[in-house]
Amino acid sequence: MPFGCGRPIWIDDESFDIANHVHVLACPAPGDDRALYDVAADLVTTRLDRTRSPWRATVVTGLTGGRWAVVVVFHHVLADGIGGLAVLAHLADGLPPPADVRAPTPPPPVWQLALDAATQRVRAIAHLPGTLRRVADGITQSLPGVTLHAPRTSLNQPTGPRRRLAVARVPLGAVRVVAHAHQATVNDVVLAAVTGAIRAVLLRRGEDITTLVVSVPVSGRASAGAELGNQVGVLPVVLPAAGDAQQRLTQIARIMRERKHGQRGASAAILEPAFRLLATFGAVHWLLDRQRMINTFVTNLRGPSQPMRLLGAPVLDVVIVNGTTGNVSVAFGVLSYAGALNVSVIADPDVCHEHDALTAALQHQLSSLIERATPAHG
C-alpha cells in the first residue's frame, strides 16, 4: 500500500520473471542427505524478496547416487502446508496443464488504494469491540482446561537465525497398526514419540518434566486444493511426556479426541485478529520470545499415497521443513509419502545442542512402539 497507509494486498506481477524465483545450487561435498538437509535449512531461513511474490524454488544438484532435489519455500501468507503440497502436486508428471491462464491485470491506481485503506481503517475501528470479543471468545473456546503456562524448559529460549534439519523415518503401515491397537490416529503415535524424545533430551540436561504443551494444527480449509492464503490455526494441548510409551499413547489418544471434539477451527479464527492487534503495537516478536503457552510445534500433512515423478525422474522422498520462531527452539513436521512416514526435526542448534540425539531418540520411540505392536512370528 502507498506510504504504508494500509494492509498489504495481492497484485499481479506484470514483469514476472521465473528467474527471480527458480535457482540452481550445487550441494557441498559429500552431497549426502546430511549435506542436503543443511542446504534446505539454510534456504528456509533465508529471507524471501518482499518486492516479489513470496516463494522460491531451488534445484539442488550434486547429490550422491546421481540424485537432485528441489527445495521450495513459501511464505506463510501465500500458502499453508496443505496449499503448498497441492501446488507441488500440480508440478508432478501426469497432471493436465491448467485449462486457462489468466493474463496479469494492472494494479489499482494509488488514489483507489488510499481510499480503500482509509475505508478499511474506519471499518476496523468500528469493528474493534467485536474483534476483541471474538479474540476473547476464541481463547475461551479453544483453550478450555489448558494452562497458559507451559513447563519451563531450557529448550524454550529465544532463538537465533541458524537452523538444523534431520529426519526420522518409519513405514506408514506399521504406524497405522500401532494406532489401530490403541484406538489412536497416526498423529497421536507421533505425538507420543515426540513427547518421549523431548523428555529424554531434557533428562540428560537434568530437567525432569512430566508434561509438555504441544501446538498441533487445526485446518480451517473446506478442501485440500491450492487456494491462496494460510487457513490453518493451532491448538495447544497438554500431553504426558513421562511413563511407558504405550500408556502415554493411550492417554494422548484420549486427550486428542476430547480436545478436537467440537473445536475444529476455533483457534484459527482468533489468530489473525490477535496478531494484527499485537502488530499494531510492535509487540509480536517481544511476545513470541517470552511466551509460556507452548513448548513445541508438531505439524502434520497427508502426502501422496503413490510415488510421483518430476520431469521424468522418480520422486524418492518428500520432507516438510516447518519453521520455529520466538522461544520455541524445536519443531516437528510429519508428512506421509508413498507408504513412508517422515518426521522432520528442525531446531536452533545454538539452543538445542543435542539435535542429533533428539532425532535418534525420536526414531527410537517410533521404532519401539512399532516393535511392541507387531505380533511375533515363530
Model-derived segments and their meaning:
Residues 1-328, 334-340, 345-363, 367-378:
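Soluble acyl-CoA-dependent acyltransferase catalytic core bearing the H(X)4D motif
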